């Protein structure tokens, strides 16, 4: 089977307000080597966003009322957007979910457990009283994107687009709305557009944290990893802090440098003080540990995340995956059932379906089929609302749907962007359609950066065996199972069978 990767929640990013976040003194920079430390760009450029207005008169509100509204808005918008691949994909390139996706967003340092529905209601009330507040419209657009993520409802994207356009009509080119456009583009998997919007902000505000982070995300999702690494260095020099540190870590993980990734995340967690920051960074550490097969550490980190915010979905899903890999399948099923009840996204739906299949009890096959059907329904809804869902289609359909559709989608996604994830998806779609010779180069490309991913190694091993490369195939399958022996309820079992048959 083609197991989905544990979602990498990359895009826990800065506030929609665009204000500077001062890192904790204990957080430091991203743990860079000394030669990089010597090249710090500590000078903070002038902030040019509308948040710099201090007289409160620009939109007709008195200073006290303006400040109160901003504080209330920040509290309500206390969840971060992910990039589209991150938020909705069956696997992430930038992965930490991704997403995301994937994209400019709200501050993880705000109070945990904030409700996007409440934020939308409050903003709508505010905008009825202040219809010319371009900041308010931009924030509403970002909140609709966040609402789509947390609800698994792409139908919010047209509403987000309308709100952002309203903001830009009132104040052409304002940073917050352009950052919102980057978030929306990433959520719809338009990473070229997201990069363009981020660059637009950075041209006149090079210290805009949301745009710096969006730029890294977009470059990662486009497979431009060397540029993403340079963008991470630039962001770390200009705006060191948790949103940048997590991206810096992921860029290193993609290169196979897990040690640096872990060190940077641990430093970020040491400096985290708010519930949102703690939940976010601990989840990143949990996902990194899970990917390396260290389930005990993964569960410890997910527990730490949930102690900070017991509603944080990526931690709940990650804990369920680690439980499944540790043999706690009843707890894993219960946990994933709760996750999909709140956000029925492809990653969690496929994971739950495969757990049902692996359990093999009465009615479990039908339960699994329902999860896979829901994936297809979500993909149809996503496409109807402007989301490029080809990667989701390729990954889900290759094992649990129309194999021909999986290959068509994988080819289409590969034509748009060459990443380790799109290479893996194309390789596996080619394999299940009987095109193993063509699949081989893509399977090897998926592992060429050094990224340590058991699913990729499993796919590579199966393709190598199918093309007569028995020694290499056995080595790849062995590496997959040594790295993460519980990487998938179905895939891990099939890897063991294939390895045994190849002896």
Language-model regions: role of each:
Residues 131, 172, 206, 239-240, ...:
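Short coil turns that delineate tetratricopeptide repeat
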Residues 136, 177, 211, 244-245, ...:
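TPR alpha-solenoid repeat register
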Residues 142, 146-149, 183, 217, ...:
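Residue-level recognition of tetratricopeptide repeat
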């Amino acid at each position: 089977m083609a197991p989905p990767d544990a979602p990498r929640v990359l895009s826990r990013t800065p506030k929609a307000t665009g204000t500077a976040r001062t890192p904790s003194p204990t957080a430091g920079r991203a743990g860079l080597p000394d030669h990089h430390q010597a090249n710090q760009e500590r000078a903070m450029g002038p902030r040019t966003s509308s948040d710099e207005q201090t007289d409160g008169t620009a939109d007709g509100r008195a200073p006290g009322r303006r400040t109160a509204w901003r504080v209330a808005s920040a509290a309500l918008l206390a969840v971060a957007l992910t990039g589209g691949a991150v938020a909705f994909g069956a696997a992430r390139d930038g992965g930490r979910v991704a997403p995301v996706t994937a994209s400019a967003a709200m501050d993880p340092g705000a109070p945990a457990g904030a409700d996007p529905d409440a934020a939308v209601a409050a903003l709508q009330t505010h905008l009825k009283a202040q219809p010319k507040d371009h900041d308010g419209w931009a924030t509403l657009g970002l909140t609709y994107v966040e609402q789509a993520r947390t609800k698994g409802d792409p139908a919010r994207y047209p509403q987000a687009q309308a709100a952002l356009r309203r903001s830009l009509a009132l104040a052409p080119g304002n940073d917050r709305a352009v950052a919102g456009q980057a978030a929306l583009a990433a959520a719809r998997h338009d990473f070229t557009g997201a990069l363009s919007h981020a660059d637009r902000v950075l041209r006149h505000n090079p210290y805009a944290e949301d745009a710096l982070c969006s730029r890294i995300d977009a470059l990662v999702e486009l497979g431009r990893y060397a540029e993403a690494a340079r963008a991470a260095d630039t962001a770390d020099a200009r705006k060191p802090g948790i949103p940048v540190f997590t991206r810096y870590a992921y860029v290193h993980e993609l290169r196979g440098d897990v040690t640096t990734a872990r060190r940077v995340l641990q430093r970020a967690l040491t400096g985290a003080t708010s519930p949102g920051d703690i939940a976010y960074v601990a989840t990143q550490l949990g996902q990194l540990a899970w990917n390396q097969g260290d389930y005990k550490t993964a569960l410890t980190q997910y527990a730490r995340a949930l102690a900070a915010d017991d509603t944080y979905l990526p931690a709940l899903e990650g804990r369920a995956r680690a439980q499944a890999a540790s043999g706690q399948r009843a707890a894993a099923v219960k946990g994933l059932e709760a996750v999909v009840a709140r956000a029925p996204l492809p990653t969690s739906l496929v994971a739950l379906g495969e757990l049902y299949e692996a359990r093999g009890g009465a009615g479990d096959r039908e339960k699994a089929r329902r999860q896979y059907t829901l994936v297809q329904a979500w993909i149809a809804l996503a496409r109807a609302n402007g989301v490029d869902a080809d990667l989701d289609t390729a990954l889900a359909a290759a094992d649990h749907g129309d194999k021909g559709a999986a290959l068509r989608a994988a080819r289409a996604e590969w034509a748009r962007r060459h990443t380790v994830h799109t290479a893996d998806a194309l390789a596996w779609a080619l394999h299940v359609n009987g095109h193993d010779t063509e699949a081989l180069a893509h399977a090897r490309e998926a592992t060429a950066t050094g990224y340590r991913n058991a699913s990729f190694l499993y796919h590579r091993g199966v393709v190598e065996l199918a093309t007569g490369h028995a020694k290499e195939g056995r080595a790849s399958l062995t590496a997959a199972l040594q790295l993460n022996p519980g990487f998938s309820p179905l895939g891990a079992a099939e890897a063991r069978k294939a390895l045994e048959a190849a002896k």
